[in-house]
Design a protein with these regions (language model features):
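Auxiliary Fe-S-binding modules of radical SAM enzymes
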Residues: 1-38, 101, 230, 236-371
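Conserved, mostly hydrophobic/aromatic
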Residues: 22, 49, 77, 169, ...
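An N-cap/entry alpha-helix motif that binds or orients negatively charged groups
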Residues: 24-61
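Canonical Radical SAM [4Fe-4S] cluster-binding loop centered on the CxxxCxxC motif
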Residues: 58-98
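Glycine-rich, proline-tolerant flexible connector loops at the mouths of alpha/beta enzymes
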Residues: 64-67, 87, 115-126, 243-254, ...
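Active-site-proximal loop/turn and secondary-structure-junction residues that shape catalytic pockets
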Residues: 67-71, 120-122, 148-152, 173-175, ...
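Core AdoMet radical
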Residues: 84-101, 106-196, 205-212, 235-238
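Catalytic cores of alpha/beta
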Residues: 152-159, 215-229, 288-299
């Protein structure tokens, strides 16, 4: 790690510069910050990132109710528990009636934003199901984020016209070489990047993200991931620690929960320092590594949390990684618990379309559009 960052006085200067201006850090500086291990140095990093989060978002956290509508997936990613080759998974796909019922329940619990997530399926049947569901959900007034993987631009456009406002498509890593080692040959990094561009053309608020702690991944790779977020001009970021799933080719990868959690938190912090005004989620995977993982994510600079509003029966079947938390907790109780936990760290829940990222609102204002 470069002395220019790790020396205490110099680290203070680097952090002060990052707090003062977005995109002020070089690749080497970001990699060095991501490599910090000393308690005092890491604490200073988190404090700097939180100061930016508070300046941009206040002491508020936006909630997105997470609705996992199916675990059928055409992809075969080597790290994912619902990959198509995993024969031990009991597969399910919710119909429009079930999805609408769960969306209505989420709205009744006070959610005004919903993330609809499933395994990746490209078919006209899937396109129509999502289209119908979006139109039926529309009267609830929910801001809907879709996370349904790679699709054609026409499909993205149809879903946007049916009422979706945000789309999260995680690139998983900005390194094409690393992506190739984590996926079969028929999976295309370039196509995933093009899908992100298509989403922007269709008018979505666009989100992406990566995993932290992948086999063979370096601090420089993660710094490049953050620069990728900037180059793609994304509005929101969802990223979390890599947690091996026992029924995948990467099941035997070494896992130090404490170190993996710390890396995930540092990635949130450095991303906040570099990009300032985007929405950053404290991933549920953080809670899989520590009971207070999501709160620690907020303290490191995140401003979005996504409580699970899927019914318990299906929530147990949607396991992307090991030790998924809150499998048996009813969604209503989960929200109340989260409110109390956020209050304990000085945060309140933000309601309404103010959940849009400041980055998105600024971009729309610059274009003369409505934020």
């Amino acid at each position: 790690m470069p002395d220019a960052v790790t020396a205490p006085g110099n680290q203070c200067d680097v952090l002060a510069r990052a707090v003062a201006s977005p995109r002020a850090l070089g690749r080497g500086e970001m990699a060095a910050l991501l490599s910090l291990e000393g308690e005092e140095e890491v604490g200073a990093l988190f404090a700097a990132a939180r100061s930016v989060k508070v300046a941009v978002c206040g002491h508020g956290v936006a909630l997105r109710g997470l609705l996992e509508v199916g675990n059928v997936c055409e992809k075969d990613c080597f790290y994912c528990g619902i990959r198509r080759s995993n024969g031990s998974v009991t597969r399910y796909r919710l119909g429009a009636d079930e999805i609408v019922r769960l969306a209505e329940a989420a709205a009744a619990q006070g959610y005004d934003s919903l993330v609809v997530q499933s395994g990746e399926i490209e078919s006209e049947d899937q396109t129509r199901l999502v289209e119908e569901t979006l139109r039926r959900i529309a009267p609830l007034g929910l801001g809907v984020t879709l996370s349904l993987g790679e699709q054609s631009e026409e499909t993205y456009r149809r879903w946007r016209e049916a009422g979706a406002v945000r789309y999260l498509l995680r690139i998983e890593t900005s390194s094409e070489a690393l992506y190739g080692r984590l996926h079969p040959a028929d999976h295309s990094w370039a196509r995933r990047v093009e899908c992100l561009r298509a989403l922007r053309r269709c008018g979505y608020q666009v989100g992406t993200g990566v995993m932290c702690g992948l086999p063979g991944q370096t601090a420089e790779d993660l710094a490049d991931d953050i620069r990728f977020f900037a180059d793609m001009d994304v509005d929101m970021i969802g990223m979390g620690p890599f947690i091996p799933h026992p029924d995948t080719p990467l099941a035997g990868e070494p896992m130090d929960p404490k170190a993996r959690l710390l890396l995930g938190l540092k990635m949130i912090a450095v991303t906040r320092l570099y990009l300032h005004d985007v929405n950053i989620a404290a991933a549920t995977a953080l809670q899989a590594l520590a009971p207070d993982g999501r709160e620690r994510g907020v303290l490191a600079g995140a401003n979005v949390v996504m409580p699970n509003v899927t019914d318990v029966e299906h929530r147990r079947l949607y396991k992307l990684y090991a030790n998924k938390p809150c499998l048996d907790e009813p969604s209503g109780r989960c929200r109340g618990c989260l409110e109390r936990r956020l209050a304990s760290i000085g945060e309140t829940i933000v309601s309404g379309r103010s959940g849009d990222s400041l980055h998105y609102r600024r971009r729309m204002a610059a274009k003369g559009g409505e934020p």
